[in-house]
Design a protein with these regions (language model features):
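Conserved ABC ATPase signature
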Residues: 171-176, 180
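Conserved ABC transporter NBD signature motif
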Residues: 84-96
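Conserved ABC ATPase "signature" region
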Residues: 96, 148-167
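Hydrophobic anchor residue at the start of the ABC signature
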Residues: 134, 186
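A short, proline-enriched helix->beta-strand linker immediately N-terminal to the Walker B motif
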Residues: 191-195
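Catalytic Walker B motif of ABC-type/P-loop ATPase nucleotide-binding domains
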Residues: 197-200
Length: 205
């Protein structure tokens, strides 16, 4: 038995599909992050608005200290503290990240949104081996076994061209060069195929 859609229904379905494609993956509206300091109020991010659609790349350009990192950390809810004042909207896949309960936000981190920090030593645990840091991230978000996670960790390190990945998983961050640590951070960020990836200062050494 076949199903025939009337002209009006077909038009509605087409409009809905087009609307879904046109919907921004990330919609930022009048985003502000101010810090209370001894000298008064520091306006690090002051009224930022933009749309980012799936598959697009957006570059935020500005001099050092202009608020680029604060902007991405605000969207990811990483600017914590009693002196931080945030307002506006950051809607990701229809959800306002700024109003999500932190329990839901922790599920978004790493799985749907990831960030590659400028200094990998701030994102890698210096006393935990590389392999464990990758496998714990993978197991938390993908629910795979230890054996599967280890195999995936090696594959991820190989994908970012880390030589002798099978050996590197047993190394500590300080035993790698800065460039290799950055590649590890990239591997972790890409592990769960996030829909949105922030890269802090991607063109620096």
């Amino acid at each position: 038995m076949g199903l025939s859609l009337g002209k009006g229904i077909r038009a509605s379905v087409t409009e809905a599909m087009t609307s879904a494609r046109d919907e921004p993956l990330l919609a930022v509206r009048d985003l502000r992050t101010h810090f209370s300091i001894n000298a008064g109020l520091l306006r690090a991010v002051d009224g930022v608005t933009f749309d980012l659609r799936s598959g697009q790349t957006l570059g935020i350009v500005g001099e050092s200290g202009s608020g680029k990192t604060v902007l991405s950390r605000t969207i990811m809810r990483l600017n914590l503290g009693n002196n931080v004042h945030t307002s506006g909207e950051a809607r990701f896949a229809g959800r306002d990240l700024l109003s999500l309960p932190m329990s839901e936000m922790t599920e978004v981190w790493g799985q749907e949104i990831a960030m590659v920090f400028q200094d990998p030593m701030t994102s890698l645990n210096p006393v935990v081996k590389i392999g464990r840091q990758v496998t714990e991230h993978v197991r938390k978000h993908l629910g795979v076994s230890k054996k599967e996670a280890k195999a995936l960790a090696v594959e991820l390190l190989q994908s970012v061209r880390i030589p002798e990945a099978e050996v590197t998983i047993s190394a500590y961050p300080h035993e790698l060069s800065g460039g290799m640590r950055q590649r590890v951070s990239i591997a972790i960020a890409l592990a769960c195929s996030p829909k949105l990836l922030f890269a802090d200062e991607p063109t620096t050494a």
